[in-house]
């Protein structure tokens, strides 16, 4: 029992930031808070942040409004427009901003890399920077280069890691998908990052959910592979329906 309590206390000491309060960011941040982490959701949209502070949820997901209010009241869920203000208190920063399609169909990483630049400009201690957004293979390395460039311009040497933790949430079932996952995929490139991500997902380990560690490119590819498989299944079913 004391071993279990010790692990839970370790998790309760986790402070994380989620950048982006869209569907993925808000659901993920709220669920992490529900599991006991201290979470700050960040968005540049001041009206959205003010609305969230007042209990106005900008998306519809069954049960989310109640969960947000419960965790705000408990002091585990916070909202801000100032990412730099939380960088010295958090252990992990999740990037969950939008990646709209360019004209050629490729993912536009502008917002992702803007967040990375801001992190590099404001961080003063070790952080793990994690992509939650759906991004192409190689994005983590672009984030790493962007952060390092910002640090170089400041003439400071601060250690950090990047990681990939793609989401597999279905609208309408997102809370259950997060709290009772079929699998959690985490891509890391250092033991230090792995230890922090293990601490964060410790409740999943305790409940015997599958938490799968791999290298970062494999984690990035896993999300695209899952999306492609879903699209293939839908196309196949449509073709069969046309034949029948």
Residue ranges and their predicted role:
Residues 9-244:
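Structural/interface elements that position substrates and couple domains in central-metabolism enzymes
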């Amino acid at each position: 029992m004391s071993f279990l309590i010790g692990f839970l206390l370790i998790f309760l000491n986790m402070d994380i930031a989620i950048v982006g309060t869209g569907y993925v960011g808000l659901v993920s941040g709220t669920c992490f808070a529900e599991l006991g982490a201290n979470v700050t959701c960040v968005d540049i949209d001041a009206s959205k942040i003010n609305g969230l502070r007042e209990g106005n949820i900008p998306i519809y997901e069954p049960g989310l409004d109640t969960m947000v209010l419960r965790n705000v009241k408990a002091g585990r869920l916070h909202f801000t427009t100032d990412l730099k203000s939380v960088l010295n208190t958090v252990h992990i920063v999740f990037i969950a901003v939008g990646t709209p399609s360019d004209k050629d169909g490729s993912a536009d990483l502008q917002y992702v890399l803007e967040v990375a630049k801001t992190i590099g400009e404001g961080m003063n201690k070790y952080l793990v920077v994690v992509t939650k957004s759906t991004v192409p293979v190689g994005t983590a390395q672009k984030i790493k280069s962007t952060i390092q460039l910002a640090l170089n311009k400041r003439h400071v040497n601060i250690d950090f890691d990047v990681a990939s933790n793609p989401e597999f949430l279905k609208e309408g079932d997102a809370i259950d998908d997060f709290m009772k996952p079929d699998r959690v995929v985490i891509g890391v490139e250092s033991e230090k990052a792995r230890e922090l991500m293990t601490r964060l997902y410790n409740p999943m380990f305790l409940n015997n959910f599958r938490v799968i560690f791999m290298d970062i490119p494999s984690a990035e590819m896993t999300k695209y592979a899952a999306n492609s498989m879903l699209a293939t299944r839908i196309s196949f079913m449509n073709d069969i329906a046309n034949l029948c």
